[in-house]
């Protein structure tokens, strides 16, 4: 999930007890789930009246139920177009803005938290954005079961939870098994765009993405922010305070 101000987003303190800590060793069998890497953190969140209304009104059209099978995505979107996956869209403001400025592309947002799903549905209704669909489920399982190899034209992962304490780095989303799986779902020439405001995580991203043999960096190291990625309010505030933001854009090698 995209993180915002840690207090506003309800992030647990980094030294908080985590419910599946004891089960970390149980996932050695499936490398994609190594040490219970998930695309989300379990959090409580209140759904507002407006979000609930949007869930009821727009959910049936724009939310795709999770299923362990690959749907006909052209039928789901009502057309054949370049398809971009976003993992963890938070409250959806950036997703909506990108979709509005790229009407020729289709965007599949994966987010587990209901307030965020409701918030994006509200924006879809207000801005008439027909090129977005949402899956409210763990992105790791969506990748495994709902997306075919070489079916994506791009992947966005903006400001994933940083897990900044060293002992929790194993919980970060960007790790070799997931990156390899993401790369397998990209078409040759398609891109993977990550962004973070934690330098240590940026360094880890650069190392992990650079080690994936099917990907190549589009820059010497970090990329300039692509014009399509909006600057969030939280990011703008951080930049004013002198905090950094790092974008990484890799492409799937041809052949």
Curated annotation (Swiss-Prot):
Residue ranges, compositional bias (Acidic residues)? 17-27
Cystine links in this protein are none
Pfam family of this protein, just one? Methyltransf_4
Q: Which reaction does it catalyse?
A: guanosine(46) in tRNA + S-adenosyl-L-methionine = N(7)-methylguanosine(46) in tRNA + S-adenosyl-L-homocysteine
Q: What is its EC number?
A: 2.1.1.33
Report the pathway entry: tRNA modification; N(7)-methylguanine-tRNA biosynthesis
Query: What is this protein's name?
Result: tRNA (guanine-N(7)-)-methyltransferase
Q: Identify the species of origin.
A: Burkholderia ambifaria (strain ATCC BAA-244 / DSM 16087 / CCUG 44356 / LMG 19182 / AMMD)
């Amino acid at each position: 999930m995209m993180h915002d101000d840690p207090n506003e987003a309800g992030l647990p303190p980094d030294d908080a007890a985590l419910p599946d800590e004891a089960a970390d060793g149980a996932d050695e069998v499936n490398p994609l789930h190594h040490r219970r890497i998930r695309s989300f953190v379990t959090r409580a969140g209140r759904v507002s009246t407006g979000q609930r209304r949007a869930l009821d009104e727009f959910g049936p059209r724009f939310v795709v139920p999770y299923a362990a099978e690959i749907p006909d995505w052209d039928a789901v979107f009502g057309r054949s177009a370049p398809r971009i996956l976003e993992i963890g869209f938070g409250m959806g403001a950036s997703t909506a803005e990108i979709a509005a400025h790229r009407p020729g592309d289709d965007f599949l947002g994966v987010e587990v938290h209901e307030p965020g799903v409701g918030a994006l549905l509200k924006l879809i209704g207000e801005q008439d954005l027909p090129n977005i669909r949402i899956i409210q489920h763990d992105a790791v399982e969506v990748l495994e079961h709902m997306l075919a190899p070489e079916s994506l034209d791009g992947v966005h992962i903006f400001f994933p939870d940083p897990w900044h304490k060293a002992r929790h780095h194993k919980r970060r989303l960007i790790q070799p098994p997931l990156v390899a799986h993401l790369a397998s779902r990209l078409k040759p020439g398609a891109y993977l765009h990550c962004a973070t405001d934690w330098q240590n995580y940026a360094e880890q991203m650069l190392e992990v993405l650079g080690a994936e043999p099917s990907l190549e960096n589009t820059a010497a190291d970090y990329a300039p922010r692509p014009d399509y990625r909006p600057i969030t309010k939280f990011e703008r505030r951080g930049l004013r305070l002198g905090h950094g933001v790092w974008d990484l854009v890799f492409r799937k090698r041809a052949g």
